[in-house]
Structures are given as structure tokens and as C-alpha cells.
């Protein structure tokens, strides 16, 4: 019998092969004395498989089965991982939304998803009632103590399904597996439709791209990524931190977990990498670091590499919720390309992960229904990055206009068709076949002299003394926009005539073609809620416009 196409299909096999290996280790209670987490809550592979089977049976008996769209609002905990694997085993469709997004946007996301079930902690159910989230959800499950809102509890369902036996739906690769909402860093979040083949493809590509092998110990600081660990046979140590605020993580607590459990690999956003870099403590057990969500600043790459063993690897995969991974680059290559990045070449995101096919097309803000409408650009030409491959998703849920704007239908030579995803990013290929990222398409600045791309301007100015980071925005109508550089300073620094002169001199020497004349110091850039690393340039553009009016 063929194994179903399902991310949970590997779990029963791992439960037989390595039943006593810890699959999930959670912080649990605070340890006595030093205030560190005890990490006394664990699940081994045998327990993860058996308990998720019981939950799946209980959920099925309650009416949450194959194809049922189910909102999941549960903090990183054993219950979160058990629940997610139970839903995958059932062939139900978990709906995941970042809890930190704007409340109105969150309500819109849940309304669009039209969920039939809602599973959450008590606080999530209170918010559901007060803010009228997901009124379509008829089946309610509480993770924890249920109060007066009806439904049942996850614990009760697990008890009810205790004798249900193995549970694994015969899911097909084309079946919907989940709806994962984007972070909404450049607009209202969109629900990305994941099919089972997309998750299975991600597992295969992540394993091959990074050489992940069963038995390793991972510290995933972005909870959804922890779901990949059990499918790869890894032990997942859930860090003692708020996953929605990686920039505020306590490096002492992270190091405590890394040292105590011999963590061999960790995943974190660039904001979390900066936390570890500033802390400056070596990471002797870590052989693989992966950072994604936004380009990692060159100084952070260099510092993290200096804290790792000499043979360790620091990977920065390029991709998006809609398609991941697309390309990967290792820290050594990033250090070699640092000078080019700081000279305005963009950020190297490395080699395309096979079997993805990445092509650069001419920038066009209009939808492209068919690939014949796209014009593929030559090596060195900046255009929109597109990708076709096993993890390229094909639609957004209940967002036909967004789907039309981001997806292109392509007919292949054998008559078959596939969907090409438009990344919404601009970039180019160099002569060595490496992909370079130049910024978001919607964040390009269209001046009278021509377009400017954020990642070809900002790194040039991030090297100026006293500057923490910069953000290029445009003020005015497209085609005649005035470029403005917003500047965030290092702690203890302040705006001054000397700083303004240094920025102007840098612009004249390094980017004369950009025509930059306005440098506005901003107290703290707005960033995305998922990785705390993507700069909210749309908000900064509004602020910059108002500032220029004041100074006119």
C-alpha cells in the first residue's frame, strides 16, 4: 500500500524506528533558583504518534474530519503539535493566522477562511466572542479550561479517542492541507492554500538543501517551522521566548536551552540573529543556523559565523509563505559578496534549490494570466522573480484578485500545465548563476530618472557611522517620486548637521544616480509582526511625506 501524501505519514514510521527519542521538548515550569525554564514537558515519538491518533479519533467523532477548515489558536506547547498532527492525520484543514496582526485584519482573515471549527486557548475564545471572530465555526474546542461558550475540550476529545487506533487519511497530493496566512507586511494578510504535496515537497527540499538528518536537535524560534522537525526525525526544543517578538528574546535563556540539550541547529529571523550576535557568546554545539524572513545584515552574518564552530554552516534561505525554499546561500558566500552588497548590487540569495525553476521577467504591476504574456529578462537585468516548482502554491483562499495578480498559468512542451508564482520581489541573476534580491516590487521608488530598488540603496548607507539601518521610500506620484532615505540611528546617536553632511557626502560618492537629497531620522522603524525584520516602508512613506510638507 502506498503511503498517503501527508506530512504526518512519516510519524508512525518514526514511532517504530525511534520510539524513545524526544520529538518535542517544551519550556514547562520555571526552574528553582536561576529562573530558567525547566523544560520538563516532553513528548517522545511514540507518544506524539499515539496521542495525536487519539486526538484525531476524538476530533473525528466530534465532526472535525477530512476537509473541515479549522482555526487553530494555540500557543507553542505539546497540545499545539499534537493537535496539528492530529488534524493532518484526519485530512482536516488547519487555518493559521499570526496572533499579533491588527485585530481588524485578523477578523477579516478569519471571515475569509470561512472556518467550520475553532480550536483555541480560553483567551482566544474570549476574543472570538467579544470581537465576533469566525461566526461560521459551529464546532468549538477549548485547549485548557472551558467556560461558558459551549463546545468541548481537547482533553475530553483525546480521552474519547483513546481506543481509536491508528489514524491516517488517504490524502492525495492535490487535497487542501492547510490555509496559512501571510504576515501582511505589505498589505492585508492573504490565506495561502497549501496542498499536501506542498508540505511534502518542503520536507524534501529542506532535507536536501541543508543536509538535515534524523537525530539532530533543533531550536526553532518560529513555531510553524517546528512542525517540520518531527517529519525529519529531529528533536525540537521549543525556546523560552515570545515567538511574536523575536527581537526581544532573552539570549541567556536561548543559550541555556542550547547548552543543556546540545542543540545542533537553530532557526531564527534576522532580528533574533542580531540578539545572539550582540550577546556575543559562542555556540559550540551548533553546526547549522538558518535565518529567513528578510535579508540578514552583513555585520550580523559575520558575527554569528565567528561564534559558530569553524565547520558550521549559516544558511539564509530565500522564499515566502507561498513558496519555500526557492534559493539558498551560505554565510561564507554572503561574506564574499558583502562588498558588492554595500556597493549597491543588492543581496545575494544564492543558488536556486533544485528542482525549482526561477526566471526573471519584466516588471509589470498587472496580472498575467498566461506565461506567453511574460517577457523573460537576460542575465544581469533587474525584474520580477518568478518560481515554478514542488512548493510553489497555486492560489489564495477566497482572494481571486490576489491569485490573479500572483499566479501565471504555463503550458509546457508536453501539453501539461503548471502554476508559476510571482514572488512580488525584484532581482536578477549574475553571470555565475546566483540570484540577487533587490527589494519588494511594490516598494520600488519610481523617480523621473528611473526606478530605485530598496536593497540596492539601503545597504550602501547602512555603513555610515552612527547608522543602524535605513529605508528608501518615495514621495509623490509614480514616475515622478522624490526619493527619501529614512534613517534609524544606533542607540545613543542623534541627528546633527555632521550626520546630515556625512549622508549627503556618501550619496554623492556612492549613489549619485539616485538623486538622494532628503535624509530623515526616524526614532524606530515599524517592522512586521512575524519576524520583526521586514521594514514597514509603506508606513514610513506616509510619515516621510508629512515630514517633507512640514519642512517645505
From Swiss-Prot:
PROSITE patterns: AMP_BINDING. The keyword Protein biosynthesis does not apply. ATP binds at residues 182-190, 316-321, 425, 440. It catalyses: a (2R,3S)-2-alkyl-3-hydroxyalkanoate + ATP = a cis-3-alkyl-4-alkyloxetan-2-one + AMP + diphosphate. Involved in olefin biosynthesis. Catalyzes the conversion of beta-hydroxy acid substrates to beta-lactones in the presence of ATP. Can use all four stereoisomers of 2-hexyl-3-hydroxydecanoic acid. Monomer. PANTHER family: LONG-CHAIN-FATTY-ACID--COA LIGASE (PTHR43767), NONRIBOSOMAL PEPTIDE SYNTHASE PES1 (EUROFUNG)-RELATED (PTHR43767:SF1). Belongs to the ATP-dependent AMP-binding enzyme family. This is Olefin beta-lactone synthetase. It comes from Stenotrophomonas maltophilia (strain K279a). The gene is oleC.
